[in-house]
Amino acid sequence: MTQPTQSSTWQQHLTRAWTHRGWLAWLLWPISLLYGVLVKLRRSLYQAGIFKSERVPVPVIVVGNVVAGGAGKTPVVMMVVRHLQARGLQVGVISRGYGRQTHDCREVCSDSAITDVGDEPALIQRSTAAPVFVASRRVDAARALLARYAQTQVIVCDDGLQHLGLQRDLEICVFDERGVGNGFLLPAGPLREPWPRAVDLVLHTGTPPAFAGFSAQRTLSRYALMADGSQQALGDLAGPTCLCNKPLLALAAIAKPENFFTMLRAQGLTLARTLALPDHYGFDSWSHNDYEGYTLICTEKDAVKLWPLEPDALAVPLVVTPEPAFLAQLDARLDRLLPTDPSPTLSLAHGHTTT
């Protein structure tokens, strides 16, 4: 049985309204027109140089989306980082650090408090071992990263398609199975900015793809991670011979928790209970006694917050596997930006301005 989420009724109605052009979407449409004017005005002010857009001396790859409510970009960020690391490149990651309670610029370390850095940056750092910095202004994070890790050759920005204060060289826009929803701007639809717009690469993690772009498969790893980094085969948790000796309780504090539960069941796991929590839930009110009779299994993003409270919880990584053509295009575009000289220092003239 799935616990109800703590999302309010109006948020649920709004999310449903974003899938089609019903009465609620049309009711909110005039506000969307005003929002669209403000979005265009803001971009124009950057293009005119009234608002400052700054460049850093290494290529910047922005991975983001144009829809509200999450489209699975963080697993794509980690996939891109690992791919670049496999090429032998020194990669750094920057992020705003959504949900953190601090406002300064800081490095994400293995012992950083989630409230100080945010759950997604903590997950990226733990999963990839790349240096990660968070700041309200991405350019501040990028500069701090380069000052601390001078050999960095590429910066990957987690989210930030709409953060025009940092110039970028490549933009990857991620879509899930919702595509652009009803095609309206906020609040009548899910779009943060008008679509289509120029980006370098479009990656669809949903099936079937909503429109032209590259495709990627989302699957769960065949193993679960423990807090100490050791692995437990998911097959050992499946069926009546489950080695955990306790019923499984699956929990997820992500945009679409039911997708996680469905994927676990597809791996043969029997879930005695499921617990759907709001995205970025902080576990501040978590009570161990309420769940002590269960083996807890969760997403990687939840685990970085849950492990201090439940060190025996299991985390199942989400694996994003893009079609080979996507990585080929990414490499080809990036190779044009990287210097032939092995030195990581680049001229400020590299790349292009996307604002």
From Swiss-Prot:
Record GO terms (molecular function)? ATP binding; tetraacyldisaccharide 4'-kinase activity
List, alphabetically, the InterPro entries matched.
Answer: LpxK (IPR003758), P-loop_NTPase (IPR027417)
Recorded GO cellular component terms are: plasma membrane
Pfam (any one): LpxK
Catalytic activity, EC: 2.7.1.130
Organism taxonomic ancestry? Bacteria, Pseudomonadati, Pseudomonadota, Betaproteobacteria, Burkholderiales
One GO biological process term = lipid A biosynthetic process
Q: What class of enzyme is it?
A: transferase
What is the name of the protein in this document?
Answer: Tetraacyldisaccharide 4'-kinase
- Catalytic reactions of this protein: a lipid A disaccharide + ATP = a lipid IVA + ADP + H(+)
Q: What does this protein do?
A: Transfers the gamma-phosphate of ATP to the 4'-position of a tetraacyldisaccharide 1-phosphate intermediate (termed DS-1-P) to form tetraacyldisaccharide 1,4'-bis-phosphate (lipid IVA).
Query: Could you say which residues bind ATP here?
Result: V67, A68, G69, G70, A71, G72, K73, T74
